[in-house]
């Protein structure tokens, strides 16, 4: 399967330099940037997440979609950075505004509201309850089979989509891949759940995800660096992505949710060698 993809360039503002001690001397070294992003809906502050700057609009859209606050881009009029140059926090506030004639349900916003800032490592911290999340997951249909070769191709694309990691060693990455093996969206972030929100948000804007997606085939695979936790499976299921591939292990709750949601969950992927923890029949396998 063809997996050629030009290596992506690092987004502006994603890399900083700091002085470090190395081999008895002081040198300048590249480090990944981590800054807060406040997400608002129609001016109402909803959440603050620690993220790496870049694709902030996609991050906000993907976050709201995964939370069930928006059903699709049809709900959204504009997504803008707030403030003026020189103001404290300029560029670190995104305001998602409702489309004309439509208002996002405030009660739905309150149901998804987080009581504490969202760290880069936690995609579900502060939510009212895990049970509330489970109630919003609808099992995916079996659909068409997916070739194991697509999983391997997705991981190759993932490896080519990490320019900031190559410079800093400090970021996670996610990529959405179509059934034809072509990349739909890729992103890096200090938080793995943020990287997933970014690619889902990009796919939403491109018309590839959502209830009215019609711009092209839906994503068939989400490939992620690091482990596959509960929040990764939840976000993939919300976006209708049938297969998740991770370079590392899933958690027990991720496996349980994947089985309940009809998502094929693959871990420790090395080429076409992998552990399949849930719904292996989609890959032509028998078992979990």
UniProtKB/Swiss-Prot annotation:
It is found in: Cytoplasm. Its main location: cytoplasm. Mo-bis(molybdopterin guanine dinucleotide) binds at residues 268-273. GO terms for molecular function: sulfur carrier activity; sulfurtransferase activity. InterPro entries: Cytidine_deaminase-like (IPR016193), FdhD (IPR003786). Gene3D superfamilies: 3.10.20.10, Cytidine Deaminase, domain 2 (3.40.140.10). GO terms for biological process: Mo-molybdopterin cofactor biosynthetic process. The active site is at residue 122. Keywords: Cytoplasm, Molybdenum cofactor biosynthesis. GO terms for cellular component: cytoplasm. Belongs to the FdhD family. Required for formate dehydrogenase (FDH) activity. Acts as a sulfur carrier protein that transfers sulfur from IscS to the molybdenum cofactor prior to its insertion into FDH. NCBIfam families: fdhD_narQ. This is Sulfur carrier protein FdhD.
């Amino acid at each position: 399967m063809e997996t050629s993809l030009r290596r992506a360039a690092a987004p502006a503002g994603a890399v900083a330099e700091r002085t470090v001690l190395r081999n008895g001397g002081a040198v300048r070294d590249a480090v990944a940037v981590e800054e807060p992003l406040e997400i608002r809906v129609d001016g109402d502050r909803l959440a603050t997440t620690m993220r790496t700057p870049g694709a902030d609009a996609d991050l906000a859209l993907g976050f709201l979609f995964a939370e069930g606050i928006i059903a699709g881009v049809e709900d959204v009029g504009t997504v803008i950075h707030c403030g003026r140059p020189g103001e404290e926090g300029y560029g670190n506030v995104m305001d998602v505004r409702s489309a004309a004639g439509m208002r996002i349900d405030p009660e739905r916003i309150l149901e998804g509201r987080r009581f504490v800032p969202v760290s880069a490592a936690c995609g579900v911290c502060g939510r009212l309850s895990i049970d509330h999340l489970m109630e919003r997951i609808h099992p995916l249909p079996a659909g068409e089979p997916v070739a194991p070769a697509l999983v391997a191709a997705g991981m190759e694309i993932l490896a080519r989509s990490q320019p900031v990691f190559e410079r800093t060693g400090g970021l996670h990455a996610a990529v959405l891949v179509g059934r034809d093996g072509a990349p739909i969206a890729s992103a890096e972030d200090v938080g793995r759940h943020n990287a997933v929100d970014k690619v889902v948000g990009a796919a939403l804007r491109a018309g590839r995800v959502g209830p009215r997606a019609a711009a092209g085939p839906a994503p068939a695979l989400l490939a992620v660096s690091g482990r596959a936790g509960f929040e990764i499976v939840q976000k993939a299921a919300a976006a209708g992505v049938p297969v998740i591939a991770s370079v590392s292990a899933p958690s027990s709750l991720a496996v349980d949710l994947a089985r309940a949601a009809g998502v094929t969950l693959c871990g420790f992927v090395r080429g076409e060698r992998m552990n399949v923890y849930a719904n292996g029949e989609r890959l032509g396998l028998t078992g979990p």
